[in-house]
């Protein structure tokens, strides 16, 4: 029995795929490289933008067309926000909410009742990651977010923060390293908020990873800039911690950041970047910017353009704002026209 696992969107979705790969193997599945080869398809969807939601629906239909005989399980943020719509799409056999992701394999066994051989589907020592030709592993360190940025639907889809224990994470990392993994990416919805619910912190987690594992290369997924304390960059004295962080600013205008309910001012962000570059040689900062947020004036956009040039990011992920039903931003007045958003995006891409 073969299962094809596919993720859209963030690195956290990819990390969850890796966990399911291991769990499916333990109950007798082997991993299919393509949906056409699979008896079961599991899709981890995204809903961060309206385009991501559209792509999630499109992918479900494409997978069903490519293999109409396969059973299909759909989970992830879009599945949590719009389960009724997914259930009406031909080919979808089971929709699993984000809150049930940890027991997804059990739900598949219980609801779909697909018979499999009760044995491992790979040779001893072969991991699910290598079956998927991967040498980098994404580690899910936490889920959920306690903040509510006005444009963000992910916090609605993912719920409250829940961190894994340091010991649990260390065990997983050491196991992956023993299997040959050379690089890990610490991922989550609110990576910088790790430990808020278990009296710990991201700093403590990284300290433990550096001290208790021999993983050669360690990276972070996106981290909110306000979560990093003054001593955080001291950790990069260890060369195993790669000198790069993705710190989303979203706008270079403080007035826009306030409407977004972001917890960082542009001045503070610039100081943080300067601190990182001062303490860590060759430190690379990448970021996210949203163009066309409701009410964004020409002056505010020009402030963003100037700020980007001032900070000098290594790379910028540019997102064109779109309303997401259920967010505060969707109810804000003074929406920006498609033409203006397109032009602002073009200018940022230059």
Regions found by a protein language model. Name each.
Residues 73, 81-82, 86, 178-298:
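Conserved SAM/AdoMet-binding glycine-rich loop
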Residues 296, 311-313:
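Contiguous mid-protein beta-loop-alpha structural module that forms a pocket-lining wall or clamp
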Residues 1-193, 231-234, 245, 267-278, ...:
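Proteins enriched for Cys/Gly/acidic motifs involved in redox and nucleic-acid/cofactor modification
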